[in-house]
């Protein structure tokens, strides 16, 4: 479904508190990176292939950019609107399936029309070699927003639905998403701001998720491919709009916080140590490790969804590289 205006208003109010207050140094030359083309790029999610090739999405432009290894240029790889896509959010390289997974959503009611008129929320799969669309799966239900995803050991894809307390699953070879887990623990705030967001597997085989507006961090026990106990973990400090989450091995992760930082996340039992790697980033929305480097998308989404209030974005749009041990 398209996002209702009350949802949009409450979302924007929560999403960009802090991001709008970032100092100008967030856009200064202390960070390197890859410039994205145009004055309307607004990168949202970023993923990487094993060879270091980057893929970047955009809710404003749609489609997917590709950045080849050792290159400082982003090229259009998936054309905006291709394979009935619209505004693009989460992206994930699935090496085993040779696919790039892409979340496609309709943000027209938020004043972001996207490159097509396709309504609804979809998970799309594109051939990593050719860029050809291969898989299209509509999110089930009425309240749907495809946000982010992770691949399980058996090749199943697990997807967060940010408008319902659901983790969805797409089994290998299937084109139909199913509700793998639905639980009140993941409920959105009363005003309807986004709930489930980042998702990753830990070295213990369990699933870890965060909630954007509430700033919670959960472990979902997984046994035999089925969900078990849900545990709300205890971060060492409050989380500020936690977003993209990626594993770095064992019980360690990296995470983007919309409040302006990218973090190292270490899970020890029910405790979560949050260590800021880099702050004063321009509205980070996603992060992916490539070797000892973190690539982070500077979303600047307040300037897209609240243009009148926030004014024009800081150009150029970028994805930035941050040393893992910064």
Where are these regions (language model features)?
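Beta-propeller blade signature
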Residues: 118-129, 311-325
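Conserved beta-strand positions in repeat-built beta-propeller and related beta-rich domains
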Residues: 55-60, 94, 100-118, 157-163, ...
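Short loop/turn segments that connect beta-strands within beta-propeller blades
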Residues: 68-72, 127-132, 171-175, 221-226, ...
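Asp-box/WD-like beta-propeller blade repeats and closely related beta-sheet repeat scaffolds
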Residues: 114-156
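Beta-rich, blade/repeat-based domains predominating
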Residues: 37-53, 59, 82-108, 139-157, ...
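Structural signal for beta-propeller blades
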Residues: 62-65, 108-111, 123, 165-168, ...
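Bacterial N-terminal signal peptides that target proteins for export
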Residues: 2-15
